Amino acid sequence: MLRSCTAGLRSIWALRGRREGAPRLSMDLQPARRLFSTEKVIHKDWALPNPSWSKDLKLLFDQFMKKCEDGSWERLPSYKRRSTQESEDFKTYFLDPKLVEEERLSQAQLFTRGFEDGLGFEYVIFKNNDEKRTVCLFQGGPYLQGVPGLLHGGAMATMIDIALGSCTGGAVMTANLNINFKRPVPLCSVVVINSQLDKLEGRKLFLSCNVRSVDEKTLYSEATGLFIKLDPEKSST
Ligand SMILES: CCCCCCCCCCCCCC(=O)SCCNC(=O)CCNC(=O)[C@H](O)C(C)(C)COP(=O)(O)OP(=O)(O)OC[C@H]1O[C@@H](n2cnc3c(N)ncnc32)[C@H](O)[C@@H]1OP(=O)(O)O
């Protein structure tokens, strides 16, 4: 597996920055062009196939895209930055200007989307609104290694948090995340995270998920999460 990962890493390096339509940033670009390129990267939807996606990931993606045709499922787009509206919504809860300088905030990016193609978190989430559940297809790249050849548990926890969060809506925060890691996840493999909203109790959303291999034979993790809808009357800081 390590050997195949090394080969994967080599081909990933060969593909660096070649996500279809992705601008290449280099130091010799003129400032105006650099700014334009950066804008394109920020507004790009990253939950779409790129050359680093394995056959398994592409196949599952195509299957779920078919399910989207009758409107029962939808693919959730994913950006490096939250929309201006979403950011404004969250800002109302974090009013203290000393907390994060505005300038720093303008550089902020969703950290799962901060890696080059194939090296970090490659994922797409599909949502079934009627059934209050989502399916996240996730391929963890070589920069997410923990124990040699295996995905870091923190990387898995991050994806579980995002997958559970995708079953919620509006301004929520993770209050509790409980994960049972049952089997280690091979680096560069594809896993499927099935998440659902189990119960809504006032501002509390109780969610659960499982993480399985593509053939569904291996159960890697099970998790539950408590998310809290933020109270507009309270500042969280
Ligand atoms: C397109 C979209 C796709 C999705 C992708 C998204 C991408 C981004 C994804 C990024 C994802 C990033 C995600 C992240 O990284 S979120 C970052 C990690 N999370 C935090 O930093 C949260 C820190 N905590 C807080 O801010 C507050 O504690 C919150 C806001 C959570 C609640 O403070 P608030 O003052 O508002 O509420 P309350 O204290 O009155 O409590 C209310 C009720 O809740 C119950 N309670 C509270 N805590 C717990 C607990 N631990 N276990 C059990 N119960 C708990 C409490 O008993 C009470 O119950 P009841 O008495 O009413 O019965």
Curated annotation (Swiss-Prot):
One Pfam entry name: 4HBT
Protein EC: 3.1.2.2
Subcellular location: Cell membrane; Cell projection, Ruffle membrane; Cytoplasm; Mitochondrion
Entry GO MF terms: long-chain fatty acyl-CoA hydrolase activity
An example Gene Ontology CC term for this record: mitochondrion
Transit peptide per record: 1-36
Membrane topology designation: Peripheral membrane protein
Annotated residues for binding of substrate: N180, K182, R203, K204
Entries under Gene3D superfamilies matching the protein: Hotdog Thioesterase (3.10.129.10)
Domain of life, source organism: Eukaryota
InterPro entries with a match to the protein in the record: HotDog_dom_sf (IPR029069), THEM4/THEM5_acyl-CoA_thioest (IPR052365), Thioestr_dom (IPR006683)
Keywords tagged on the record: Apoptosis, Cell membrane, Cell projection, Cytoplasm, Fatty acid metabolism, Hydrolase, Lipid metabolism, Membrane, Mitochondrion, Mitochondrion inner membrane, Phosphoprotein, Transit peptide
Residues carrying Phosphoserine: S37
Disulfide partners: none
Posttranslational mods: Phosphorylated.
Residue positions of the active site: D161
Biological processes, Gene Ontology terms: fatty acid metabolic process; negative regulation of phosphatidylinositol 3-kinase/protein kinase B signal transduction; regulation of mitochondrial membrane permeability involved in apoptotic process
Reactions this protein catalyses: hexadecanoyl-CoA + H2O = hexadecanoate + CoA + H(+); octanoyl-CoA + H2O = octanoate + CoA + H(+); decanoyl-CoA + H2O = decanoate + CoA + H(+); dodecanoyl-CoA + H2O = dodecanoate + CoA + H(+)
Residues recorded as bearing N6-succinyllysine in the entry: K55, K66, K98, K204
Principal cellular location given in the protein's record: membrane
Subunit structure: Homodimer and homotetramer. Interacts with AKT1 in the cytosol.
Known function: Has acyl-CoA thioesterase activity towards medium and long-chain (C14 to C18) fatty acyl-CoA substrates, and probably plays a role in mitochondrial fatty acid metabolism. Plays a role in the apoptotic process, possibly via its regulation of AKT1 activity.
Annotated family: Belongs to the THEM4/THEM5 thioesterase family.
Protein name: Acyl-coenzyme A thioesterase THEM4
Organism per entry: Bos taurus (Bovine)
